[in-house]
């Protein structure tokens, strides 16, 4: 594994020889060429600053991407280069971009370079340690060889699309179907039930959404358990390309030094690929399939291989994925899918029924939904639930034409059980308590399997559908049914 600390070489100064947008060429003395990925610093003088207090100088960071001969490097700027001129002095830091790590990151919002964006005026922050964002993945002999299920306590996930400890999960869903709430809930559950910490990387999405997320997380009480790194769509492509690495470096510290289980969110992983394509084009590389960068698989692999379990502790990653034009064969999502252990698809149809989390049980998948990993009982129960839901889906067109009363007895039973299963797959979230007025619930996987097995066996055929909505486990179901009977009796 790479060293935790990178020792900076003796700083060397160069000068700017070419400025073309965010691509900068810098000439250095012979024998003092900076390494690839080194961070360079250059100061831009703001000659138009007229008002009192307006910044006269701005320092920007450049990252070395290519060597051009013996004395010139080609760099990508991480901030706008307006005002940068040829001949400007550039300082080589002698090391890659390094960011703060440790408890100081919790409750704070960072940019790609590790600068704190939400520091209060009276707040004193002491950064005791910084790690470089370019690091090697864990060595093979340090990896956790055992595949374990990551229990979330969310019924639909644990039963039908179980997450892998230290695995990568793809999260699909349009606007307004509950992606943000699911992300907040997972952050809450990791802190509450796994004693872990969460890191969020906002990559190339809308600034408004990032601002809303921070506000909602503060309101839900999960901000203090989370480190956030943002490089939104108004940022330079070099910034958007490196934001996931900054967040991942912070997550690696919690895993490797503090021995914690970490949940890493990346929203949106497609924007990481898109930024890589922009940088590749700016550097003049020959494009590959559909105009993407030729090193697409290598770039994606270098990020994903660092997201893994080491002996005893893990980084589990939840990655929102945008699929261009719903084309799953596009190289960007196709390259991402190769690394995923599970997919969770949020459905607008299910959300419209008022069932949350609105996970589509038939479209969502997991590689560990296999008797070798989850056990025979779990596997059989999940398959029975899916079979009932699939049959119900097939019967919907017939029901729309002739009505449910015209179905055979077996199909009627299937439809009734499917409706109960759909309602029971919903669940109250801790972070939504103040909006719903109902307490959140954690349902152990064993209890989830037992409950759905009973529904499939017909144990609850006499219990009305309404009793299954907005509850947690078996005890909640029986208590709600008991209260409904008392009300009916009264």
UniProtKB/Swiss-Prot annotation:
The EC number(s) given in the record are 7.1.2.2
Write out the annotated subcellular location.
Cell membrane
Q: Which GO terms describe its molecular function?
A: ATP binding; ATP hydrolysis activity; proton-transporting ATP synthase activity, rotational mechanism
Binding, ATP: 173-180
What catalytic activity does the UniProt entry give for this protein? Answer: ATP + H2O + 4 H(+)(in) = ADP + phosphate + 5 H(+)(out)
UniProt KW keywords? ATP synthesis, ATP-binding, Cell membrane, CF(1), Hydrogen ion transport, Ion transport, Membrane, Nucleotide-binding, Translocase, Transport
Which top class of enzyme applies to this chain?
translocase
PANTHER family with a match to the protein in the record:
ATP SYNTHASE, ATP SYNTHASE SUBUNIT BETA, MITOCHONDRIAL
Q: Report quaternary structure and partners.
A: F-type ATPases have 2 components, CF(1) - the catalytic core - and CF(0) - the membrane proton channel. CF(1) has five subunits: alpha(3), beta(3), gamma(1), delta(1), epsilon(1). CF(0) has three main subunits: a(1), b(2) and c(9-12). The alpha and beta chains form an alternating ring which encloses part of the gamma chain. CF(1) is attached to CF(0) by a central stalk formed by the gamma and epsilon chains, while a peripheral stalk is formed by the delta and b chains.
Q: What does this chain do?
A: Produces ATP from ADP in the presence of a proton gradient across the membrane. The catalytic sites are hosted primarily by the beta subunits.
Q: What is the similarity comment for this entry?
A: Belongs to the ATPase alpha/beta chains family.
This one is known as ATP synthase subunit beta
Q: Which gene encodes it?
A: atpD
């Amino acid at each position: 594994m790479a060293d935790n600390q990178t020792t900076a070489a003796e700083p060397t100064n160069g000068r700017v020889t070419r400025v073309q947008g965010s691509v900068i060429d810098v000439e250095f003395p012979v024998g003092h060429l900076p390494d690839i990925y080194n961070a360079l610093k250059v100061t831009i003088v703001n000659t138009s600053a007229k008002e009192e207090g307006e910044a006269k100088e701005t320092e920007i960071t450049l990252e070395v991407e290519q060597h051009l001969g013996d004395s010139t490097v080609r760099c990508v700027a991480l901030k706008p280069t307006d005002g940068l001129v040829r001949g400007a002095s550039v300082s080589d830091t002698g090391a890659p971009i390094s960011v703060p790590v440790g408890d100081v990151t919790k409750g704070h919002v960072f940019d790609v370079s590790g600068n704190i964006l939400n520091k209060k005026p009276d707040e004193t922050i002491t950064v005791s340690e910084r790690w470089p964002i370019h690091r090697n993945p864990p060595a093979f002999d340090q990896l956790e060889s055992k595949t374990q299920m990551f229990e979330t306590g969310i019924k639909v996930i644990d039963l039908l699309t179980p997450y892998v400890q230290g695995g990568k999960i793809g999260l699909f869903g349009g606007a307004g179907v509950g992606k943000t709430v699911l992300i907040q809930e997972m952050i809450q559950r990791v802190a509450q039930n796994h004693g872990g910490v969460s890191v969020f990387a906002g990559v190339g999405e809308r600034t408004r959404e990032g601002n809303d997320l921070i506000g909602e997380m503060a309101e839900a009480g999960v901000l203090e358990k989370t480190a956030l790194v943002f490089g939104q769509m108004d940022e330079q492509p070099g910034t958007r390309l490196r934001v996931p690495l900054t967040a991942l470096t912070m997550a690696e510290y919690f895993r490797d030094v503090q021995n914690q289980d970490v949940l890493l969110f990346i929203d949106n992983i497609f924007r990481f690929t898109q930024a890589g394509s922009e940088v590749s084009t700016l550097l003049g590389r020959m494009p590959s399939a559909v105009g993407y960068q030729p090193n697409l698989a290598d770039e994606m692999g270098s990020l994903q291989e660092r997201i893994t379990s080491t002996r005893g502790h893990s980084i589990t990653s939840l990655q929102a994925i945008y699929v261009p034009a719903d084309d799953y064969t596009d190289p960007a999502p196709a390259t991402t899918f190769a690394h995923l252990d599970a997919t969770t698809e949020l459905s607008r149809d299910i959300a419209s029924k008022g069932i949350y989390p609105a996970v589509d049980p038939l479209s969502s998948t997991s590689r560990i939904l296999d008797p070798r990993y989850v056990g025979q009982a779990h596997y059989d129960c999940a398959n029975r639930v899916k079979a009932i839901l699939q049959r119900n889906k097939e019967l919907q067109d017939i029901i729309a034409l002739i009505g449910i009363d015209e179905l055979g007895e077996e199909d009627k039973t299937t439809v009734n059980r499917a409706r109960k299963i759909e309602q029971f797959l919903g669940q109250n979230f801790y972070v939504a308590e103040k909006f719903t007025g109902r307490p959140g619930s954690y349902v152990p996987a064993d209890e989830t399997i037992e409950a759905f097995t009973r529904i499939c066996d017909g144990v609850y055929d006499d219990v009305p559908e309404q009793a299954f909505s907005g509850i947690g486990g078996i005890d909640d179901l029986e208590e709600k049914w008991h209260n409904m009977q008392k009300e009916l009796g009264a």
